[in-house]
């Protein structure tokens, strides 16, 4: 018996020594927990609007570090009750919790409960990999012990609550409080604190934005555990458990937006490591009020367009498409010509195979990009045929005329659905919106707005096609001689092409470069906007017109300050006169006529002094309106993400202009209703539109702007006298 005991004791000692031999090198090679004393996790940088209001945040991780003193006791207690009930008493690992978890998991036949402490979670997340091996678990336990020997419990809790991922892009309790509730962590109520503590186990599964019922059940479980641990009274429990979820639903898709993406790209490309570290204060030119109006105007305008073209709705997220698809499950049959939501099955060359609840269909892709999407709109064509409907999209850019500051920019109808920023990346044909460049070129050659141009149809050689091309007018009418003013106001295509031929490519391309359109090609179809531009480029070009020949380069970053208060950069307007004021003032008057008597007449409802130009491309693929007051210039584009017709008569006037009006009717009220500056070299005279002479008391007249010396001097009376002599 004695030998047996000695033998067993020897085995135990040998195992213990072997364990020490195995553990000591691992323990010695563990990271030094003192590194946490200087731990500076990536934090968010704050982006402010032009008035100093917080617009949003950017960064690798959305985190705002807060000291333990700012975190309420009920928030701390919620996490302790849920994640580590013995946190205040264990030494880094909790043997009781490990045994309890082992028993529960054994009985369940699967892992349903963990035994890791908060300190172990901290060790794993900050120092170790996520591989599931015995060695990693041992390292985690040993490192947790080391951390407990280095820091007090309050510091460990502070590190944990600032490090933990809580879903929706939020790291730490302060960021999560802002994302889910729109408030600081020290402002959270008991039920709100419990919801945050419900998230570490599975942030996606219990995300209250997407799974409110699960989140509510999990929150109530946290409250129950707080009651069991004595952190709250039965009365507090009853009050909190009966409260509904109160998350800030508008933050569901606010992880970023098109403008924040622009800021992030700019800062990270320019500052690299400094940007990754975060904690910058970035002051921008954007006005939050303008931006909200822009987003609403674009969204409402696209809804109107969607209704016209037959789209059942415009999704804000992929979730919207999924819900619509599920609702279609009750359909008994598909109606030919109707648009449905279909599930994408696979791509087959230039075709896409889709399904609508058992009905498999096939449609041509035509350049459609559905990356990241599982569902798509389709028009049922009968049999197994479908027309794949691309995303209806739009963008809006608004720039301060006098400074070049971008005041609002929206790159699409929903950032959550598509992150592609059409305002700065989408290359689209501007259609007739390019025409002011040609008309200004004619004025620089000595013509006036009442000079006439032959507007008859003529064939022109198109080098891109290698054949003759005859321009057509939107209204399919034929015209004779018309004034430049009338031709621009009514967007007569044949007049624009003939004028381009008369003025010559060299001057037109030169003027294009001066307004920032440096990719114009010497083709006659240029007069109809066959070049590709971004909405930002085209809007910036109109800024030069609105500012009477002075270009102010568009910019959106005013100042960047680092965490120490050092100014990294500060930007001011860069303005330069690129075109003569007198000649540029004349096309501004002509663009005013577009609003007063031409294709943009509906903009006159603004009762403000504005000017602008519609644009519609071939087959109604792109719809534009770019217009301005003396203070603000705004461009709107509407179209599909691929080159596809919006439908017959879906012109810039019908599609884009209403969005522009909705935005400008609010924004222009923030400025004086003043006319455009009249340089001393210009003169305003009343012109009789019938005879193109000076109006006097014998005839009606329309006020028009001329460069002094180019205005007519014959009056209606003079003309009548001359005709009488004949």
Curated annotation (Swiss-Prot):
> A Pfam family matched by this chain, by name?
Transpeptidase
Q: What does the record list as GO biological process?
A: cell wall organization; peptidoglycan biosynthetic process; proteolysis; regulation of cell shape; response to antibiotic
- The active site annotation covers 83, 432
Q: In which pathway does it act?
A: Cell wall biogenesis; peptidoglycan biosynthesis
List UniProt keywords, sorted A-Z. Answer: Antibiotic resistance, Carboxypeptidase, Cell inner membrane, Cell membrane, Cell shape, Cell wall biogenesis/degradation, Glycosyltransferase, Hydrolase, Membrane, Multifunctional enzyme, Peptidoglycan synthesis, Protease, Signal-anchor, Transferase, Transmembrane, Transmembrane helix
GO cellular component term, pick one: plasma membrane
Top-level taxon of origin? Bacteria
The gene designation is: mrcA
Record's protein name: Penicillin-binding protein 1A
* Gene3D superfamilies per UniProt: Biosynthetic peptidoglycan transglycosylase-like (1.10.3810.10), DD-peptidase/beta-lactamase superfamily (3.40.710.10)
For this protein's source organism, the top of the classification is: Bacteria, Pseudomonadati, Aquificota, Aquificia, Aquificales
Region Transglycosylase, as annotated, extends over 45-213
**Disulfide bond positions:** none
Query: Could you tell me which residues belong to the region Transpeptidase?
Result: 379-662
- What catalytic activity is recorded? [GlcNAc-(1->4)-Mur2Ac(oyl-L-Ala-gamma-D-Glu-L-Lys-D-Ala-D-Ala)](n)-di-trans,octa-cis-undecaprenyl diphosphate + beta-D-GlcNAc-(1->4)-Mur2Ac(oyl-L-Ala-gamma-D-Glu-L-Lys-D-Ala-D-Ala)-di-trans,octa-cis-undecaprenyl diphosphate = [GlcNAc-(1->4)-Mur2Ac(oyl-L-Ala-gamma-D-Glu-L-Lys-D-Ala-D-Ala)](n+1)-di-trans,octa-cis-undecaprenyl diphosphate + di-trans,octa-cis-undecaprenyl diphosphate + H(+); Preferential cleavage: (Ac)2-L-Lys-D-Ala-|-D-Ala. Also transpeptidation of peptidyl-alanyl moieties that are N-acyl substituents of D-alanine
Residue ranges of the TM segments? 4-24
Topology relative to the lipid bilayer, per the entry, is: Single-pass type II membrane protein
- According to the UniProt topology, which residue ranges lie Cytoplasmic? 1-3
Record topology, Periplasmic segments:
25-726
Main location (coarse class): membrane
